[in-house]
Amino acid sequence: MTDTSPRTEPADWATDQEVRWCPGCGDYSILTAMRMLMPELDVDRENTVFISGIGCAARFPYYMNTYGMHGIHGRAPAIATGLAMARPDLDIWVIGGDGDMMSIGGNHLIHALRRNVNIKILLFNNMIYGLTKGQFSPTSEVGKVTKSSPMGSLDSPFNPISVALGAEASFVARTHDMDRQHMMDMFRRAHEHKGAAIVEVFQNCNVFNDGAWEGITKKQNRDANLITLEHGQPIRFGADDEFGVVVDGGAAKVVSVADVGVDALLVHDEHKPDPSTAFMLSRLARGPFEPTPIGVFRATERIEYASSSTSQLAMAHDNQGSGDLAALLRSRGTWQV
């Protein structure tokens, strides 16, 4: 009889490092979900890498018994890109918060996504700067009163899902820290995807922005405001599936199913090459108090970056032969500048 049990246990993926997040932080549940998922993926710790930037979320590599790098602010996607190019055999995860990824790291993030580098990005979004003690972040709502905006923030927030879709990311998903199984499902889907995958995680900072997502994630609010996307299914939600989503006038809108009928509802297609419909879904909610989709927004196939680069180098080698650096240095060609 074949033994199909996992080769590792969740405890094998834990380290001896003391976890230094605040008690009650949503990061704990994300860490637990990841540790529980790893044995199910049946991957080797020696071939798994977690790379982070700066911030509360960035301590994640210390707590996973794998290779890892605690990088510099915003640069985790760039570091991960280099590693993915040099070692395409590795499982590479990138961890960062909304401040780290959407502010100083914004350019690195969108270029890693558009290039389709084979890395898996988890963006912990708590709509606040936590490590620096409570300033408004690029995802904070307009009017947010913080230490750095005592009269309220004037900045319109980024929507990470919209940004990712605008960068033509081939895999885009969203989950939240109150549902461990859903987190594991989204992380698993990201891992299975060949190319750049980003998962936004609604995460609670109970010290500096407590309850930011409770309008969506709190148990008594989920029926009214949490829309779970399922490929091939009409988009419905509510305690009795009494609400649905339609496309009207170029925008996604919430309707009563009794008013329009089931046949009028938008059927979710995560494999649709054009990201327009997924983008409309990402704009459905104007803030963390309205019906908000979670799940996989987009999962399309295109060649990942390292494969493209390898093919290009092979073509150059076939057409021009192997390079000779020593011969180049000894050549008589000179340039004046």
What are the residue ranges of the model-derived segments?
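Active-site-proximal loop->helix
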Residues: 106-113, 131-144, 163
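Conserved thiamine diphosphate
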Residues: 9, 89, 137-190
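Active-site diphosphate/adenylate-binding microenvironment
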Residues: 7, 11-72
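ATP/pyrophosphate-binding catalytic subdomain of soluble kinases
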Residues: 170-226
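Glycine-rich beta-alpha junction loops
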Residues: 54-56, 126-128, 179, 202-207, ...
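Flexible, low-complexity linker and terminal segments
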Residues: 1-7, 16-17, 207-337
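Short coil/turn connectors at secondary-structure junctions
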Residues: 17, 44-48, 76, 86-92, ...
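Thiamine diphosphate
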Residues: 52-130, 184
